[in-house]
Amino acid sequence: MNIEQVIRDYLPQIIHMSLGTSQDNKPWVCEVHFVYDDNLNLYFRSLTSRRHSQDIAANPRVAGNIVKQHVVGEYPLGLYFEGTAELLGNEDERRAVEPLFKERLGAAADILTEAANPDGHQFYKITVANWYAFGKFDGDKGQKVKLAWNGGTASQDATDA
C-alpha cells in the first residue's frame, strides 16, 4: 500500500478539517476549510482574533483530522496529522497560495486585499510532520498507518497514533 497516494487521493474529497490547538494546557478544536499544495502542506484562512489563531501564536504545534462523514455500518476512512502552524505574514507567500483558495474553495477575488488588513482573514500554513490514515486499505481489516513527512518520525508503526 502506498500511504502517500492514499492521502493524495483522499484530500480532494473533503474541504474542511478539524484543527486542534493548545495554549496553557487548554486544548481547543475547531473546523476550518482548507487547501493543500503538492508538498502536502495545509493552508487555511482565519481571523487573528479567533481562539485557534491565538493558540497558534503562542504554541505552533497543531494536530487535526480530515474525515468524511459516514453512516452506521459504513467503515470510516480518515486522515490525521500533526505538525506546526504559522501565520503567513509575507505578501509573496500569501500570493503564492491564493490560487489554491480560489480553485478549490471558490474564494472571493479580494482575499489578498483582505489579508493586507490586520483585521481581515489571514493565511495560515500547516507544515505536516506526520500523516496517519485510518481505514480499510488492503482487505477487510481496518488499520491505521503512519507516514513521516517533513522531518517527522520515521516509524511506520502507527500503534502510537
Model-found features: residue ranges?
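Extreme N-terminal tail/first-helix region
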Residues: M1-H16, G151-A161
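Alpha-helix boundary recognition
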Residues: L11-P12, A57-A58, K102
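Short beta-strand segments
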Residues: I14-T48, I56, V62-K68, Y75-Y80
